[in-house]
Regions:
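Glycine-rich, aromatic-flanked loop segments that form ligand/cofactor-binding clefts
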Residues: 105-145
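Metal- or metallocofactor-binding catalytic centers and their adjacent structured scaffolds
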Residues: 41-116
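Solvent-exposed alpha-helices and their adjacent loops that cap or buttress functional pockets
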Residues: 29-32, 124-127, 195-197
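Conserved, mostly hydrophobic/aromatic
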Residues: 3, 45, 66, 104, ...
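Metal-dependent enolase-superfamily TIM-barrel catalytic cores that perform enediolate-based chemistry
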Residues: 130-240
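Structured beta-strand/loop patches that form or line metal/cofactor-binding pockets in enzymes
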Residues: 1-50
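Glycine-rich, charged/polar anion/phosphate-binding loops
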Residues: 22-25, 119-120, 154-155
Length: 240
């Protein structure tokens, strides 16, 4: 089943999510945001879709790499297509990113699932038919309606538990917030959430690599006392 075409459609949709200068998401006034839909079509008309930021799948990337590699290949040969794209990465001057490759792979899996009338989880082995979900906060901020204090984190966590979540991951304050990172304030937010939700909810935190080694060690020891299950990306890997 050969691939016949690769196309991208950019569309707008209403959202109340805004991004700061570091790319972190926060609540905001309703506005229009852009999204791109990548469509891979096979010769029999089967289609697969994925959704990406428009800048990741911009026309140059689609024309210079996606179409050059994909058109004419068997849509089921995902690993071969992946390796062929990787071959072009080194000389792409960072145009063909890992994110771009991931959206191609997602669309190919979607195409296979639609063609075979099977969910992708069955195509990759079917070990589980369900997975646990966790609620996730946005990053801390100083915005109205956002997460500006430990108490607001606690209140948001209570809302997530009321919706049925058994686990929660926190994203605390990060640059460009003026006072971030602030390890002691982050620990206060973690403690407030633990007190609010009780001992039976699994808690996690994503440090987004802002802490130093000593700060990460301090936070890790405090999280251990609070029985947190996971401390994600506490510092830059180069800091090891």
């Amino acid at each position: 089943m050969k691939i016949e075409s690769v196309n991208v459609t950019v569309f707008t949709y209403p959202t109340r999510r805004v991004s700061d200068s570091a790319g972190h998401s926060h609540p905001g006034e309703e506005s229009l945001a852009k999204m791109a839909m990548l469509t891979i079509t096979a010769e029999d008309g089967s289609k697969g879709y994925s959704f990406a930021p428009p800048e990741v799948v911009r026309p140059f990337v689609v024309n210079a790499f996606f179409r050059k590699v994909l058109v004419g290949q068997d849509a089921f040969n995902r690993e071969r297509i992946w390796q062929d794209l990787v071959h072009w990465q080194r000389g792409s001057a960072h145009q063909l990113t890992e994110r771009a490759l991931s959206f191609v792979e997602q669309a190919l899996w979607d195409l296979a699932g639609r063609k075979l009338n099977l969910p992708v989880w069955k195509l990759i082995g079917g070990y589980r038919d369900r997975v646990p979900a966790y609620g996730s906060t946005m990053c801390g901020d100083e915005l109205k309606g956002g997460l500006s204090t430990p108490d607001e984190y606690a209140q948001f966590a209570e809302t997530l538990v009321a919706r049925g979540y058994k686990a929660i991951k926190l994203h605390t304050w990060m640059p460009p917030v003026a006072f971030a990172p602030n390890p002691k304030m982050d620990v206060k937010a973690c403690a407030a959430v633990r007190e609010a939700v009780g001992p039976d909810i699994d808690l996690m935190i994503d440090g987004y690599h802002w802490y130093s080694r000593t700060e990460a060690l301090y936070i890790g020891k405090e999280l251990e006392k609070l029985n947190f299950a996971w401390f994600e990306e506490p510092m830059e890997e180069e800091s090891m």
